[in-house]
Amino acid sequence: DYIAIGKFKKNKYKNILKGIYKGCKISSCYLSGGETAEMPGIYNKDKFDLAGFCVGLVDKEKILDGKKVKNNDLLLAVPSTGLHSNGFSLVRYILKIKNISNKNILKELLTPTKIYVKEILKLHAKNLIHGCCNITGGGIIENLPRILSANKAVEIDLDKIKTLKIFKFIKQNNISDAEMLKTFNCGIGFCLIINKKNLNKVKKVFPKKFKPYPIGKIIDFKSKKIILNGKIKF
């Protein structure tokens, strides 16, 4: 990890590290090292910049490269906890323009990102997934094509997506459906592609709050990688 901070404050630094350690523990990974830079000339005393990355290993034959994805495979949505650290530039703009200071909304915006590592590793070990992707910046529109081979596409029923209150709030501020889909996860933190016969086995791996559910299926590619039907019920 890397932390740049305006003025070193022990308690604040300690809380930041606690969060990093907690994330590593949930992900079953180690914090191998890091750097802390105190930069008063760059950052205000109460500001900090945090960055980090993870490196993993996988056997070549176990890489999910899209080759396992077949026609009529199910596309599953795994619920998110909120924004998952994406789309905050647009959200800050809305809060500023509308002069919003509702504590419930602000608290919901700070809901920690769900980390799916343990569930995904269990599914992968049992050979239950053909493809998967984290829904971050770009939403389902930009992230799903990355896990599809050149000859496959996905058909999505938007009306099956179970969105969250925070996205309903954002949508109410004159944000188009297209902008919502390309900026936010809209309630989907992770996507899985599986054989439909394995649906119940896959669902059992997740706790109740994060049970995956079908929102589409795999089809042959014709002209678009993502075919959208219906509308999200914001």
Predicted regions: what they are:
Residues 88-99:
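Short, compositionally biased
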Residues 12-32, 43-48, 98-110, 114-234:
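Glycine-/charge-enriched secondary-structure boundary and capping motifs
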Residues 1-88, 217, 231:
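Glycine-rich anion-binding loops of enzyme active sites
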